[in-house]
Amino acid sequence: MASLTSLIFVSIVTAAHGQTVVSIPLGHNYTLIGPPITSEVIWAKLGSVDYFDIICNKTKPIIVTCNIQNLTLINVSKVYSGYYYGYDRYSSQYRNYLVRVTQLKTTKMPNMAKIRSDDNSLETFTSPTTPDEKNIPDSMIAIVAAVAVVMALIIICMLLYACRYKKFHPKKQDLLLRLNI
């Protein structure tokens, strides 16, 4: 049994790149096609209690039917999600499946009374008004205040630079820096 476990584990690791992803709607049946056979295909579900579980002889928690090559999943539920690995006992042929169980999306016809009431609400709809002085958003006030502060800082920096330049360079006569401060 240990050699069979190691054979399956090594085969799965090498075959991980060749898996087929299958999405099965909840409650449907689906047949996983096994590899070409020389004797009989053994199917295992990975991630079970013993890391893998040979599933053709089991009845719980999943119900399946097996023939010599294929595995049919019956009345699929969320328990069926996982990795399925089918391999031929006497050759190196295998198939690897990732089964995902999906919920069917059903469309529901809308209620006609609700549609009529929605039509009435469209008739009474009014367009939004422009913001007045009472409805100015706080973000707009913050942006205007930030711009005013930055402009004041730039003006203060320019004045300080002009005063410092005149103090340290008294002999230079720059037309822009003729301030009598």
Swiss-Prot record:
UniProt-listed InterPro entries: Adeno_E3_CR1, Adeno_E3_CR2
Domain of life: Viruses
Pfam families documented for this protein: Adeno_E3_CR1 (PF02440), Adeno_E3_CR2 (PF02439)
Glycosylated residues in this chain: 29, 57, 70, 75
Keyword Glycoprotein: yes
Record key words, sorted: Early protein, Glycoprotein
This protein's record includes keyword Metal-binding: no
Protein's job: E3 proteins seem to be dispensable for virus growth in tissue culture cells. They are potentially important for virus growth under special conditions; E3 region may help adenoviruses to evade the immune surveillance of the host.
Family listed: Belongs to the adenoviridae E3_20 family.
Designated name of the protein: Early E3 20.3 kDa glycoprotein
Species in which this protein is naturally found: Human adenovirus B serotype 11 (strain Slobiski)
